[in-house]
Curated annotation (Swiss-Prot):
Speen, lungs and liver non-parenchymal cells. It is found in: Cytoplasmic granule. Residues 24-25 form a propeptide. Its EC number is 3.4.21.-. This is Granzyme K. Residues 1-23 form the signal peptide. InterPro entries: Peptidase_S1_PA (IPR009003), Peptidase_S1_PA_chymotrypsin (IPR043504), Peptidase_S1A (IPR001314), Trypsin_dom (IPR001254), TRYPSIN_HIS (IPR018114), TRYPSIN_SER (IPR033116). Belongs to the peptidase S1 family. Granzyme subfamily. It comes from the Eukaryota. The active site is at 66 (charge relay system), 110 (charge relay system), 208 (charge relay system). GO terms for molecular function: serine-type endopeptidase activity; serine-type peptidase activity. The lineage of its organism: Eukaryota, Metazoa, Chordata, Craniata, Vertebrata.
Length: 258
């Protein structure tokens, strides 16, 4: 996000990606039943979780563009619940290619495809999450966000186990208002805000790239926010609009043809 003077930080575990404090952990949530979210991916650098992601094709993961970093021996882990345990259902992949959206710049268009070097083996613990989103989510809609991010706003370490929290969609008009983000950043039509009126439920550091699911539909990706768990600074998400879905389909088309 173009977070100018209000200083926002992307939700990347262990790495501050922009100004001063844009977040990425699950605040106020709970641990999910192990392996009940089989579409979740952990993007890791040198074996350390940095961002979440979503498996949308056996060889493709969708995540946030700001999760990209040169070097660092990047891998993607599928089928995980605990990041530290040697779970037999885990599948680990080298990354063949990072493809950020061509319009990504300082947070706008914060979406990226990752092509795995080999295709995942789909089974009970590793499954796809299909794109069925529309351009609009009604204000007040309850949604779930999932990730391995921090669980306390003042502790910047990731959660070992997968967490989930229910957040509420906040209208773009309100999120851009003076009492919220005041257009720093501007919440565009390709973005959406979600949080909690009391600031008790939020995404935060380490959750970037994970899914926002509303009534069973994959609508958005975690992007960032100002710190964590602040009522008038909710999480900011990349909305999976028609523009992005068309781009995704164009990139996946050659893979589907094989």
């Amino acid at each position: 996000m173009s977070f100018s003077s209000s200083a926002l930080v992307f939700l990347v575990a262990g790495i501050y990606m922009s100004s001063e404090s844009f977040h990425t952990e699950i605040i106020g949530g709970r641990e999910v039943q192990p392996h009940s979210r089989p579409f979740m991916a952990s993007i890791q650098y040198r074996g350390k979780h940095i961002c979440g992601g979503v498996l949308i094709h056996p060889q493709w993961v969708l995540t946030a563009a700001h999760c990209y970093s040169r070097g660092h021996s990047p891998t993607v882990v599928l089928g995980a619940h605990s990041l530290s345990k040697n779970e037999p259902m885990k599948q680990t992949f080298e990354i063949k290619e990072f493809i950020p959206f061509s319009g990504f710049k300082s947070g706008t268009n914060d979406i990226m495809l990752i092509k795995l070097r080999t295709a995942a083996e789909l089974n009970k613990h590793v499954q796809l999450l299909h794109l069925r989103s529309k351009n609009y989510i009604r204000d007040g809609t309850k949604c779930q966000v999932t990730g391995w991010g921090s669980t306390k706003p003042d502790v910047l370490t990731t959660s070992d186990t997968l967490q989930e929290v229910t957040v509420t969609i906040i209208s773009r008009k309100r999120c851009n208002s003076q009492s919220y983000y005041n257009h720093k950043p501007v919440i565009t039509k390709d973005m959406i805000c979600a949080g909690d009126r009391r600031g008790e439920k939020d995404s935060c550091k380490g959750d970037s790239g994970g899914p926002l699911i509303c009534k069973g539909v994959f609508h958005a990706l975690v992007s960032g926010g100002y710190k964590c768990g602040i009522s008038n600074k909710p999480g900011v998400y990349t909305l999976l609009t028609k523009k992005y879905q068309t781009w995704i389909k164009s990139k996946l088309a050659p893979s589907s043809a094989h």
